[in-house]
Structure formats: structure tokens, C-alpha cells
A protein has these predicted regions:
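Short acidic-hydrophobic surface loop/beta-edge motif
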Residues: 49-53, 285-291
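Short, low-structural-confidence N-terminal segments
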Residues: 1-89, 342-547
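Well-structured core secondary-structure elements of compact alpha/beta domains
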Residues: 65-90, 165-191, 195-237, 250-271, ...
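Extracytoplasmic/secretory soluble proteins
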Residues: 149, 153, 316, 321-322, ...
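Charged, solvent-exposed helices and adjacent loops that form client-binding or oligomerization surfaces
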Residues: 2-7, 64-91, 106-203, 218-223, ...
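Sec-exported extracytoplasmic/periplasmic mature domains
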Residues: 68, 72, 96-113, 117, ...
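A sequence-level detector of short linear motifs
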Residues: 57-59, 140-146, 287, 298
């Protein structure tokens, strides 16, 4: 068999396995195998501990191997260094969530037997085989028999027995056990939901609200709190809430006397706020309730029960009950998971992961201080990435990830007003951003990074350097329409600075965009023509498809 023939044979063989494994990955039951590890940790000590969750270790080698298993499912679609950093961070988050849930289940005394694990594994395998069979015989006329499915598999060099074997090997019984424990624990938590008619009817209770907002944007938070307390005292003493809103409120509702207008249900509000407000009678007030940018005082203007007219119809009542139960289960599960995470002891040792976690939560620090805390957190994240760089021992992938993330942080700090940089800080952040991108490009190639670099050069009025980066990206980006639209926009920014060069560059980009749009039209027409002539063909699965 020729090399080309062998490659085609292996592609045909693997497409079934890859498709089948995709669904297994989706439910998180593929085990940690032994692999070389593409990502590369920031530390050489592969036996080290990345983190401890309530005292339980996340071993570095286990993490790297699991990341390797994850990336193997995306062959041919390798991420950029920044995307890889995000993927590694998300994997860490998912591992932590899984560990916390399993620990909670163990603490609650949840048990799962071997028979339950074996049964669930067989269910997963049978489910995937059924889905594969349905796809394999989608264009077949007549009965979709097991024999016909086997014949289709044979044409691609596979057998049903082999697929089942490969699937079974890919499933880690311990992870199946963990999933079952988590499910049992959640089912146990949900058992406490009141599903009586009274509870279902109460879910249709609605309140109409008015509010007074005392902002901390123009005063310290402590002063905002005291002002809100003074206004609340006036409201409780009998003064008109609408007049107080018109006089003191600092939000869009002040013109309407604080009236929000529409009625809301308990499920439309955050749990704690809903519990407070739905415990009030019409005309009563509550507060002051702290928000990110001040304090809010609420008044329940009116109450009503919006029970549907057809509620007493048995069929409709069942539908309403089912919807209510689903909503309550989702709320209870979300709260349980939030409480588990909130009460967990999470100690992270890996500086790259530390930097990721800080960066991910920077938005939560935006508030009335003009972005001071958020900016401090961004700098803290940069320090962690720098620490990771120092510990990388020259690992090029780890260096590319860390420098990429530092680049984006400096870019955000100098390009957005959310973090309120001073004029000098903008200059400093821009220069550090340029340096960081250039460092990242020593270890990775990325059109996204080069486009970001060009943007920083434009702000720095280094137009020649910006033009060079944009030309490189344009010449090497063959498929992404949006990238060429970005390039066109950046050339427009430099029209007056380098008119003799930019005019031709704009024309080139416009031509690329027009040619691309024409190719897309032709491809669409060809696809429609092919679909019109579609006849029964051998089963072919896109390896990237999950089902």
C-alpha cells in the first residue's frame, strides 16, 4: 500500500473512533492516559503539585496528561498560544469543580457500586453506537439494520467490535464513578424541592418594584451608605417614595418616581434579593442593599398572582409543574455548586494558573474606584506570569503562553478606559505591551499577536513598524475574512500618516475581501447544486463532529 493510500485508510479508520470519542469527552469520562504532553508546564518538576483542593492534590503530571488527551481530540486545529493558555485554564477550572463536587458527595456519604459503573459505561457505549449507526445509514433506503451498519464500517476498515473496544479503553471507570456520585448528590439535594400545588401556584406570584439608587461614583462608598440609610429612614417614616426617588435617586428610574414599571417573578431576581423583596407587603420598603456602584432602596409597589387561566386543566397543570420543577432544580443545583466552591480551600501553586485565575476575574473588580483595583489585579496577574517565565526553564510553549497573556493585559490597560490609566501609564503600558508581544513572537507565530502589535505601533505613531506587521498578517492569512477587515480598518487609521503606501494597501485589502466574497458565493452555489444531485453514498464522518 502506498503512503497516500495508507494515510487515507487510517483517516477512514480513525474517523469513527474520533467521532465516538467526541461524545465520551463531552460527558467527561475519558480517563487520564500516559502521553508526552504538548502543552508543557512552567516547571520541570513533573511530579510536583499544581494545587490543593481541600487538601487533595492536583498533580502536575496528571494535569499535563489530561491536557494532552484533550488536545488530541482537536488534531488539525492547534490553538494559538493565548488560546492554549485559556484552554489550560478552563481545564484547571473543570478539574477543580469536579473535585469539589466529588468531595461533597463523599462527605455526604454517597456510594456508587461497581455494577452501577459497569451499567453506565455500557449505556455510554450503546448510545454512541446507536448515533454512529444512525449517521452511517442516514442516506440508506429501507431498513437500517445492524448488518448494513457493519458493512459500512467494513468499507472504512473498521468493525463494530473494534469501535466498542476502543471506546471502552478510552473510558476511565473512576471518572464514571465520580460522575455518578455527583449526580446522586445533586439528586439528593433536589429532593428537598417543594412540588406541591401551593408551591407551583406561588411561582406565579409577581411584584412591581420602585427603587432609589444612591451612587458611589460621585462620593465614597461609606458616604453613599449613610445617605442611603437617611433616605430609607425618610421612606419608612411615611414620606412619599416617588418624591424621594425624584429628589435623591441617581439612576434612570428617578424621573418616573423610581417606578420600574413591569412586574417581576421570584425567578427573575437574584436569590437573596428575591427572598427579601417577596417577603414584603405592598407599600413596604427594604434596603439599603449594596451594589457594585452604590446602594439601592426598594419599595414593593404592588403584588399579584399571575396564575394562568388554564392552570386547572390537568394536562396544562402538569406542564406548569414540570417547568417549575426544572427551574427550581436548576436554581438549587447552581446554589449548591456555588456554595461548594465558595467554601472550598483552593491553594494554587502554579504561577501561570494563578495569573489565569486573576485575569479571569478582573472584571469583578471594576467599580466605583475608577478601575484602581482592577488595574492592581492586572499588574498582579502580570507578576505571576513573569514568575512563571522565570520558572519555565526555557520551555518555548510555556514562554509563548505567558508572554501572550502579558501582552493582552498591557493592551487592555493602555487601550481601554475601564482601568483609568493616567497619560503616562498609557505610554508605559503601550511600550511594555510592544516588548511583550515581541517576546511572545520569539516563541510562537500568531496573526492575532501581530495585529495587536500593529495596533500598539499605530498608537505609538510608529507607522512603518505597524505597516510591516499588517503586511505580514495580510500575506499569511488566507482564510479569515474578519482579520482582513481588521487590517483594512487599521490602514484607514493611517491614511493621513502614510498616504503613498496606505492607498495601495487599502486597494489590495478591498480586492482580497471582494475575491473572498465571490469565492464564498461560488462555493455556496456549488454546495447547493451538489445537494440537489445528492444520491446514496458511503458513510463519511467529519472527525470534528460530535454527533
Amino acid at each position: 500500500m502506498s503512503i497516500v493510500g495508507m494515510r487515507k485508510f487510517m483517516q477512514g479508520k480513525m474517523q469513527y473512533v474520533m467521532l465516538a470519542l467526541a461524545a465520551v469527552m463531552a460527558v467527561g469520562i475519558v480517563g487520564i492516559g500516559i502521553g508526552s504532553g504538548r502543552g508543557g508546564s512552567v516547571q520541570d518538576d513533573s511530579s510536583g503539585v499544581m494545587a490543593k483542593i481541600n487538601g487533595e492534590k492536583i498533580e502536575r503530571q496528571d494535569f499535563e496528561t489530561q491536557y494532552q488527551n484533550q488536545t488530541e481530540q482537536n488534531q488539525g486545529n492547534l490553538p494559538s498560544a493565548f488560546e492554549e493558555a485559556q484552554a489550560r485554564g478552563r481545564l484547571f477550572d473543570s478539574i477543580v469543580d469536579q473535585m469539589i463536587k466529588v468531595q461533597a458527595a463523599e462527605k455526604a456519604g454517597v456510594k456508587v457500586g461497581r455494577g452501577e459503573v459497569k451499567k453506565k459505561i455500557n449505556e455510554y457505549i450503546n448510545m454512541r453506537i446507536s448515533q454512529l449507526k444512525e449517521q452511517a445509514l442516514a442516506n440508506r433506503k429501507g431498513k437500517k439494520t445492524d448488518e448494513a451498519f457493519e458493512a459500512e464500517l467494513k468499507r472504512s476498515g473498521m468493525s463494530l467490535a473494534q469501535i466498542k473496544t476502543d471506546l471502552r479503553k478510552a473510558i476511565d471507570p473512576k471518572m464514571v464513578q465520580d460522575q455518578l456520585m455527583i449526580q446522586k448528590q445533586m439528586d439528593k439535594i433536589k429532593e428537598g424541592i417543594d412540588t406541591s400545588d401551593r408551591a407551583v401556584k406561588a411561582s406565579f406570584d409577581e411584584i412591581q418594584l420602585a427603587q432609589i439608587t444612591v451612587s458611589s461614583k460621585t462620593r465614597p462608598m461609606a458616604q453613599a451608605e449613610q445617605r442611603a440609610k437617611d433616605v430609607l429612614a425618610k421612606a419608612r417614616s411615611g414620606e412619599s417614595f416617588a418624591k424621594l426617588a425624584g429628589q435623591f435617586s441617581e439612576d434612570a428610574y428617578s424621573a418616573s418616581g423610581g417606578d420600574q414599571g413591569a412586574f417581576v417573578r421570584k425567578s427573575n431576581l437574584p436569590e437573596e434579593l428575591a427572598s427579601t423583596l417577596f417577603g414584603l407587603k405592598a407599600g413596604e420598603v427594604a434596603g439599603p442593599i449594596k451594589q457594585a456602584d452604590g446602594y439601592v432602596i426598594y419599595q414593593v409597589k404592588d403584588r399579584r398572582n399571575a396564575l394562568p387561566a388554564d392552570f386547572n386543566d390537568p394536562k396544562k397543570r402538569k406542564e406548569y409543574r414540570d417547568t417549575y420543577v426544572q427551574q427550581e432544580q436548576a436554581i438549587v443545583q447552581a446554589k449548591a455548586e456555588s456554595d461548594m466552591r465558595k467554601n472550598a480551600s483552593i491553594v494554587v501553586n502554579d504561577p501561570e494558573i494563578k495569573g489565569y485565575l486573576i485575569t479571569k476575574n478582573i472584571g469583578s473588580y471594576l467599580g466605583p474606584d475608577g478601575g484602581v483595583r482592577a488595574k492592581a489585579k492586572a499588574k498582579e496577574a502580570i507578576k505571576e506570569f513573569e514568575k512563571a517565565i522565570n520558572q519555565s526553564s526555557g520551555n518555548s510553549q510555556a514562554l509563548a503562553r505567558c508572554y501572550s497573556q502579558i501582552s493582552y493585559l498591557y493592551y487592555v490597560m493602555c487601550k481601554t478606559g475601564l482601568l483609568s490609566p493616567t497619560p503616562q501609564e498609557k505610554i508605559d503600558f503601550r511600550k511594555k505591551g510592544i516588548d511583550s508581544v515581541n517576546q511572545a513572537l520569539k516563541y510562537t507565530e500568531s496573526n492575532d499577536l501581530r495585529t495587536l502589535l500593529a495596533d500598539l505601533y499605530i498608537d505609538d505613531k510608529n507607522y512603518d513598524a505597524a505597516l510591516k506587521e499588517l503586511k505580514y498578517v495580510s500575506d499569511n492569512e488566507f482564510y479569515d475574512y474578519n482579520v482582513h477587515m481588521q487590517i483594512l480598518g487599521k490602514y484607514e487609521q493611517m491614511k493621513s500618516a502614510r498616504p503613498e503606501i496606505v492607498a495601495q494597501r487599502i486597494a489590495d485589502e478591498q480586492k482580497w475581501i471582494a475575491d473572498y466574497e465571490q469565492r464564498m458565493k461560488e462555493a455556496q452555489a456549488a454546495q447547493e447544486a451538489q445537494q440537489a444531485e445528492q444520491t446514496t453514498k458511503p458513510f463519511k464522518v467529519n472527525p470534528g463532529s460530535g454527533g
